[in-house]
Amino acid sequence: MKKTALLAALCSVVSLSSCCRIVDCCFEDPCAPIKCSPCESKKREVNGGCNSCNGYVPSCKPCGGELDHETKQGPQARGIQADGRCRQ
């Protein structure tokens, strides 16, 4: 019984941390791929549900590989179009 409770507690902590990482990479990074969906990631349960965003790691460069972001300000400097969509 104690092992079951400990395992359940551990899984909830892992799920919570996975959830935070999903929010970080899916919603804060405008360049996250379309397939990077928290719901789909949870449905797949890859590696026990611990593989947030299917292994996607947010990049620190603008979408489209542009390097001349010194001249741009605000969201456009991060590769976001004026209407909020990520530049492809």
Curated annotation (Swiss-Prot):
<keyword id="KW-0472">Membrane</keyword>
<dbReference type="GO" id="GO:0005201">
    <property type="term" value="F:extracellular matrix structural constituent"/>
</dbReference>
<protein>
    <recommendedName>
        <fullName>Small cysteine-rich outer membrane protein OmcA</fullName>
    </recommendedName>
</protein>
<dbReference type="InterPro" id="IPR003517">
    <property type="entry name" value="Cys-rich_OMP3_Chlamydia"/>
</dbReference>
<keyword id="KW-0998">Cell outer membrane</keyword>
<keyword id="KW-1015">Disulfide bond</keyword>
<keyword id="KW-0732">Signal</keyword>
<feature type="lipid moiety-binding region" description="N-palmitoyl cysteine">
    <location>
        <position position="19"/>
    </location>
</feature>
<keyword id="KW-0564">Palmitate</keyword>
<keyword id="KW-0449">Lipoprotein</keyword>
<dbReference type="GO" id="GO:0009279">
    <property type="term" value="C:cell outer membrane"/>
</dbReference>
<feature type="lipid moiety-binding region" description="S-diacylglycerol cysteine">
    <location>
        <position position="19"/>
    </location>
</feature>
<feature type="signal peptide">
    <location>
        <begin position="1"/>
        <end position="18"/>
    </location>
</feature>
<keyword id="KW-0133">Cell shape</keyword>
<comment type="subunit">
    <text>Part of a disulfide cross-linked outer membrane complex (COMC) composed of the major outer membrane porin (MOMP), the small cysteine-rich protein (OmcA) and the large cysteine-rich periplasmic protein (OmcB).</text>
</comment>
<dbReference type="GO" id="GO:0008360">
    <property type="term" value="P:regulation of cell shape"/>
</dbReference>
<dbReference type="Pfam" id="PF03503">
    <property type="entry name" value="Chlam_OMP3"/>
</dbReference>
<comment type="function">
    <text>In elementary bodies (EBs, the infectious stage, which is able to survive outside the host cell) provides the structural integrity of the outer envelope through disulfide cross-links with the large cysteine-rich periplasmic protein and the major outer membrane porin. It has been described in publications as the Sarkosyl-insoluble COMC (Chlamydia outer membrane complex), and serves as the functional equivalent of peptidoglycan.</text>
</comment>
